Regions:
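An N-terminal, well-structured beta->alpha segment
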Residues: 7, 14-113, 203-232, 243, ...
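Gly/Ser/Thr-enriched, mixed-charge loops and adjacent short helices
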Residues: 17, 21, 25, 41-45, ...
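Conserved phosphate/anionic-ligand binding catalytic regions in large, soluble enzymes, centered on
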Residues: 48-66, 153-156, 239-247, 307, ...
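N-terminal small/polar loop signature for handling phosphorylated ligands or for N-terminal nucleophile
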Residues: 97-160, 258-313
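Glycine-rich phosphate-binding loop plus the immediately following alpha-helix
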Residues: 166-194, 329-352, 357-367, 420
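Phosphate-binding and adjacent anionic-ligand microenvironments
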Residues: 295, 299-301, 322-324, 342-532, ...
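Short "domain-exit" segments at the C-terminal end of structured domains
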Residues: 537-541
Length: 541
């Protein structure tokens, strides 16, 4: 009975998409779903509206209210335009940057968004082709814009696309603007969307921004001399068909590296990602072609960026000469260890310097920071929180690096999102520094463990798609809260941190408050054998 009622509701909702307000292609797709005896696709496409969350939109592409298409993207852009015109009502020239990655329909969604912004009187700096997410963040700051968007679904499967919204500092939107934008987006109907653009307000940008951005990225090199000595470092790089192909090889060359070997089949822009199961640089499968090339040429390092070039995965040879993946925690550890140790060694460290990591990233980073007397801050998962720490400290302290276990790293403050362009360049410098001492990156990692303590981290992703999946994940989180484990892996739980209630509970049941800027659906269990288990609900865009 419940299912019949749901089918009735989604059918009524879908039939509204058969009106002239929607194009013929969309109407044909909706009609096909309505006529299909199996209503699974119809239900999942229309059972809810694709939520414009604090990070923007993300969803499967197709017709429907719960899909990424020109109407859901259009509503998001119209809502953001409305908010910008309210928020900056006294400003003469409101402007935004619009970028996109390699995904199917990304360029189409970007152009439609540019038209809508311009139709609302907002000047648009539109990238001429795909660009890395961090360059979009940089361009917002470079042009002094009030906002910006990037059409991307990061490393999600090929069926997905997304819409990331940024504020005037180049960071993803935070409170109070995030919820205010959501309110505006939720008010928009298809009739409200201004699709007819004003070409006089759209400025195409490209190589001139690339040059300024790459010059700034080059400025963060800590030890150019070691690169000069190791300029022939053998690097294998793959963009996994994405936006990294545009700038990462150029950045490596600008830093002075001369032996850059790109995986040719994966240098081709392709939103279907034909050479990988999923374009996620965390996965061994995604790096298999790069590692095969590395074995063939006896390379020193393998790096892969995801489709929008904000995350980077890395592999190197272990002590037996076998190629191994370096996970996000290990990469972040090496990244920040090098920044701290070598800034100190070269006399570049200042008393007000600080680093940032997320609460789910390895605690060994804190050990490195503490021993070297550098301030380290913990923040929520997501680079917008790292960007928040940078913004709060502007003019008072200097951010020198940060990262998260999900393969996102940032060594500069002129970008306010994770940056695979600068990260690949700096990781190559770290590899050159190691080789200059007769070591590998693996040797460096082992030395860090010996000095600061051994640690092993594992990430388990549980994927539950669709409406039923969202309900199942919610039930799992509710159960953990209602029935917290007394022991994990044979070790008693000594402390629980609940970031949804902002409560810390010790083994005796004493409760105290956690000092965080807002709540987040994250649970942490600390055990007596010093294990730490994080459980979190994924952010839904």
């Amino acid at each position: 009975m419940e299912n019949q009622e749901l089918i009735k509701q989604v059918t009524e909702k879908a039939e509204k998409w058969l009106t002239p307000a929607y194009d013929a292609e969309t109407q044909a797709e909706v009609k096909r779903m309505l006529e299909n005896p199996d209503k699974t696709e119809l239900i999942d496409s229309f059972y809810k509206d694709l939520e414009f969350g604090t990070g923007g939109l993300r969803g499967i592409m197709g017709a429907g209210t719960n899909r990424m298409n020109i109407y859901t993207v259009g509503a998001a852009t119209q809502g953001l335009s409305n908010y910008l015109n309210k928020c900056f009502a006294g400003k003469k020239d409101i402007s935004v940057v619009v970028g996109h990655d390699c995904r199917n329909n990304s360029d189409k969604f970007a152009k439609i968004s540019a038209d809508i912004f311009s139709a609302n009187g907002i000047k648009v700096y539109l990238f001429d082709d795909l660009r890395p997410t961090p360059e979009v963040s940089f361009a917002i700051r470079h042009f002094g814009c009030q906002s910006g968007i990037n059409i991307t679904a990061s490393h999600n499967p090929r069926e997905y696309n997304g819409y990331k919204a940024y504020w005037d500092d180049g960071a993803q939107v935070l409170a109070p603007h995030d919820t205010a934008i959501i309110d505006e987006v939720n008010k928009v109907t298809v009739a409200d969307i201004k699709f007819n653009g004003n070409k006089d307000l759209i400025q195409i940008i490209g190589k001139e921004v690339d040059k300024v951005y790459l010059d700034m990225v080059h400025s963060i090199s800590i030890d150019p001399e070691v690169i000069r000595r190791q300029k022939d470092l053998s690097i294998v790089y793959t963009p996994l068909h994405g936006a990294g192909r545009v700038l990462i090889p150029d950045s490596l060359k600008e830093w002075g590296f001369e032996n850059i070997n790109c995986v040719p089949e994966q240098m081709v822009k392709d939103g279907n990602f034909p050479t990988v199961v999923s374009p996620n640089p965390e996965n061994a499968e995604a790096l298999s072609m790069a590692i095969a090339l590395a074995k063939k040429i006896d390379a020193d390092i393998v790096m892969a960026s995801d489709p929008d070039a904000d995350r980077v995965g890395m592999a190197c040879k272990d002590d037996k000469g076998e190629w191994v993946l370096i996970n996000g925690n290990q990469t972040c550890l090496i990244f920040l260890y090098y920044i701290i140790k070598n800034r100190i060694a070269m006399g570049k460290m200042q008393p007000n310097d600080f680093i940032v990591k997320t609460i789910v990233t390895t605690e060994l980073i804190k050990a490195v920071a503490d021993k070297n007397k550098i301030e380290m801050r913990d923040c929520y998962t997501g680079f917008k929180w790292i960007a928040r720490e940078i913004r709060l400290s502007e003019g008072k302290q200097q951010y020198i690096g940060g990262g998260e276990e999900s393969y996102g790293f940032l060594a500069e403050d002129f970008v306010r999102d994770k940056d695979a362009v600068s990260a690949c360049s700096l990781l190559a410098e770290i590899c050159a520094w190691a080789k200059d001492q007769g070591k590998t990156l693996y040797d460096v990692l082992m030395e860090i463990y010996v000095e600061y303590g051994f640690s092993k981290e594992t990430t388990v992703n549980v994927v539950k798609p669709g409406k039923s999946g969202a309900e199942e994940i919610k039930a799992m989180m509710d159960n953990f809260r209602a029935n917290p484990p007394k022991e994990i892996g044979g070790s008693a739980v000594s402390l629980i941190k609940d970031y949804k209630t902002l409560e810390l509970t010790d083994a005796q049941g004493n409760v105290s408050k956690l000092d965080m800027p807002e709540t987040s659906n994250v649970l942490q269990y600390f055990t007596v054998d010093l294990s730490l288990i994080h459980i979190s609900e994924p952010t839904r865009h």
